[in-house]
Amino acid sequence: KPGRGTAEAKGDHGKIDVLTGTLGKAIGGAAGGYISGKKDLISYMRQKARTYIFSNSLPAPIVYGASAAFDLLMKDKSLVKKLHKNTAYFRKEIVKLGFTILEGDHPIVPVMLGEAAVAQDMSKELLKAGVYIKGLWFPVVPKGEARLRAQISAALSRKDINRALKAFEKVGKKMNVI
């Protein structure tokens, strides 16, 4: 997979009128997002889309950082390969530890915990162990489907991932999750 999103993965680039993307995860992890499409459509959206009209421009450092990240991804194909390798490794190892994850190969790995209180507590305990990970619960996800959202990156070394996995194991056992 080249890592250029769903449209490319599905071979749908020529069939899509509006392409949206986030800058809050893969590209720099800062904030914001983008839409792209034909000039007339984008011009219309700038005049009519309330979310655009009543919002602020992204700060210049975020735009510059995202642009630099896109340039880097275009030049260095090894980053996408490393991301896929890191993702596959984390997914395989977290399941070996006894955690349940949603299937897939996406670098955002939902570690399913069920109850909101468990996700909240585990997120706090992992932070104490040096791993920052967001918990999600109702109303963000359906009731009973609370989870931790692990975001795997090409910037992580195998040592980083193993350290996170050890923290998951320690906290998971302490909380009787695994």
Predicted regions located by residue number:
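Alpha-helix N-cap and loop-to-helix initiation/capping positions
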Residues: G11, G114, L156-K159
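Hydrophobic side chains in well-ordered alpha-helices
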Residues: Y44-M45, M122, A164
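Conserved PLP-binding catalytic core of the aspartate aminotransferase-like
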Residues: K81-F90, V95-G130, V140, G144-E145, ...
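Membrane-embedded alpha-helical bundles of multi-pass transporters/translocases
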Residues: R4-T6, A129, I133
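Beta-hairpin "wing" of winged helix-turn-helix
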Residues: G135-W137
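Active-site C-terminal subdomain of aminotransferase-like
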Residues: K1-D105, A117
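Short, solvent-exposed amphipathic alpha-helical segments in soluble enzyme
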Residues: S36-K38, T51, E125-K128, A167
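PLP-dependent enzyme catalytic core of the Aspartate aminotransferase-like
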Residues: K128-V131, V140-I178
